[in-house]
């Protein structure tokens, strides 16, 4: 329950992609603003929940982290089924992970049909520019072709564009459609939320790289 006594609106976000692309790191960076250099593959499905503040509104995000290994694929459709947002992550240094985006999008569409689900494609590990195999332009083109609403490149290691990604996603949710607040309202609300433990305030998050588009 929120402090006003009203239940927070909850949005389920499912993270999809091949093993090792950085799905867990993306969640960890957003939740705790940390990065773990020691890779551990997700076993099955992990779940985390976080309260997020934006535009004088507070919502609850349910983040579902799925395993990329083939042996866990049979578990994933049931978690896609009632999701509001599907984030498909690929590694910009691994072309194979990029080529599998089509399959993940197909899985989402098979489970969600024509329902209103927000598709996001994220190219992670943008800090590894010397090892890049997929250009930003190629990623943007793929996102538009597959009907993704959001495309962005991130670096969970460096912290680039992670909060900006979630801000862009939040702005696409029904809760924030046509949401307006004055600078004074935002300043006062931001100050108040700084004292709320466990709440992520993304009001001031901005894109840090020229590698994002609203598709």
From Swiss-Prot:
Disulphide bond pairs: none
Q: Where is this region: Disordered?
A: 178-215
Q: What positions does the entry give for GTP binding?
A: 17-24, 65-69, 124-127
User: What Gene3D superfamilies does the record point to?
Assistant: P-loop containing nucleotide triphosphate hydrolases (3.40.50.300)
Name the membrane topology term: Lipid-anchor
- Gene Ontology molecular function terms on file: GTP binding; GTPase activity
A GO CC term? phagophore assembly site
Quaternary state and interactors: Interacts with YIF1, YIP3 and YIP4.
Which family does the record assign? Belongs to the small GTPase superfamily. Rab family.
Additional comment: Present with 7720 molecules/cell in log phase SD medium.
Its biological function?
Protein transport. Might participate in post-Golgi transport.
This protein's name: GTP-binding protein YPT6
Organism listed in the record: Saccharomyces cerevisiae (strain ATCC 204508 / S288c)
Q: Which gene encodes it?
A: YPT6
């Amino acid at each position: 329950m929120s402090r006003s006594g009203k239940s927070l609106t909850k949005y389920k976000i499912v993270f999809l992609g091949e093993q090792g692309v950085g799905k867990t790191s993306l969640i960890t960076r957003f939740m705790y603003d940390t990065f773990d250099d020691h890779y551990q593959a997700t076993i099955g499905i992990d779940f985390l929940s976080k309260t997020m503040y934006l535009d004088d509104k507070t919502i609850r995000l349910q983040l579902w982290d799925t395993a990329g290994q083939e042996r866990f694929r049979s578990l994933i459709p049931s978690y896609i089924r009632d999701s509001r947002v599907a984030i498909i992550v690929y590694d910009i240094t691994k072309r194979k992970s990029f080529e599998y985006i089509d399959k993940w999008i197909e899985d989402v569409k098979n489970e969600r049909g024509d329902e209103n689900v927000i598709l996001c494609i994220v190219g992670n590990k943008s800090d590894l520019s010397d090892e890049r195999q997929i250009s930003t332009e190629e990623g943007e083109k793929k996102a538009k072709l597959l009907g993704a609403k959001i495309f962005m490149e991130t670096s969970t290691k460096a912290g680039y564009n992670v909060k900006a990604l979630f801000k862009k996603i939040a702005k696409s949710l029904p809760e924030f459609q046509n949401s307006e607040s004055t600078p004074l309202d935002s300043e006062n609300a931001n100050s108040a939320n700084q004292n709320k433990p466990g709440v992520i305030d993304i009001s001031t998050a901005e894109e840090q790289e020229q590698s994002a588009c609203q598709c």
